[in-house]
């Protein structure tokens, strides 16, 4: 297995910084800006992480405004998008205390979103901002990215990829994976933020829910309503796929049982959240609590000591408190049991998935072991035939998708995703043959 250069000694800071850097190919970062920031950030110091990336985001924002003033659409788009990404990353490490305790988080994220919304308006294709009706009179924010007219697939309506976020992503971050890729192939990509994610968590304080089909159901309802009210969009409601990475891979599988979904790509998802946490926590601590041997106060006390010693553990449990709406770490642990693909009666939820499904794994992940995640998910898709309508791809090298959520290999992951969807949706493309001959170039005009 190939190794890569480390920018930070701690695996957590290194992984999260690589996550930011990985978006450079799709205008989510500028290499010089990012490397300059890396030199200023102190390892495992969330304050230096925040202040440095806030400064970097502000500089990119100023560049975007300068490009706007001079009428440079490309420059404005690029600078606004990477400014948004830097600001999104800046607030990422600030999660001490309950939601709202750190008053820098929400305004920083809102600024990131505002810059993102400016940037995507300078895309070649249209971006439709969505307000998706949800339970209790709430709405969920979403984006529908349409392909440019010149990129439409000849002779057919526009196929759609529904891209769910994960456990700690924002939908603006998700843009740099599939929405930045799919429209150039003629696909529309729809992203949204559900409870426990992004601005819906930090502003509206809606906790996450394990039955994600109750979230994607209203999203699909809204998509169908939009397509009906605006037939001029030519959205192909008979060819809708769903995808997501990491926890988003779990969410995608929950959504895939909906008959309106015709294909699913679950990228590095998990079968159960408890098994994931069990692999990340000292065995005696995890097993002691889950068996009832350790009381809440004992578990909270022991974990409190571990969190003081390890920033990653502190960050992860702080975030999980936010996302699950829990007040203690013991409450967080109890909430995990509901996040599983096994039904309460012991049967498999995945048996209800009838659409073709691609399941991926990450062999170099420090979060999941493909043997207990990817393989188990694949085997539980019992309504699908091996190698016919279910497939498995486990990457090992970091450069080609070996890290969790395909961090560092977004381009290759997107290529594999849309190539597989083309096959499932019957989309045939002519092989390409690059040529610099003047006659060939003129004939294409």
UniProtKB/Swiss-Prot annotation:
Transmembrane segments: none annotated. The active site is at residue 246. Disruption phenotype: Results in significant reduction of pseurotin production. InterPro entries: AB_hydrolase_1 (IPR000073), AB_hydrolase_fold (IPR029058), FrsA_esterase (IPR050261). One of its GO terms (biological process) is melanin biosynthetic process. Coiled coil: none annotated. Its EC number is 3.7.1.-. SUPFAM superfamilies: alpha/beta-Hydrolases. Pfam families: Abhydrolase_6. One of its GO terms (molecular function) is hydrolase activity. Keywords: Hydrolase. Induction: Expression is induced under hypoxic conditions. Pathway: Secondary metabolite biosynthesis. It is an enzyme of class 3 (hydrolase). The keyword Chloroplast does not apply. Homodimer. Belongs to the AB hydrolase superfamily. FUS2 hydrolase family. Alpha/beta hydrolase; part of the gene cluster that mediates the biosynthesis of pseurotin A, a competitive inhibitor of chitin synthase and an inducer of nerve-cell proliferation. The PKS-NRPS hybrid synthetase psoA is responsible for the biosynthesis of azaspirene, one of the first intermediates having the 1-oxa-7-azaspiro[4,4]-non-2-ene-4,6-dione core of pseurotin, via condensation of one acetyl-CoA, 4 malonyl-CoA, and a L-phenylalanine molecule. The dual-functional monooxygenase/methyltransferase psoF seems to be involved in the addition of the C3 methyl group onto the pseurotin scaffold. This is Alpha/beta hydrolase psoB. It comes from Aspergillus fumigatus (strain ATCC MYA-4609 / CBS 101355 / FGSC A1100 / Af293) (Neosartorya fumigata). The lineage of its organism: Eukaryota, Fungi, Dikarya, Ascomycota, Pezizomycotina.
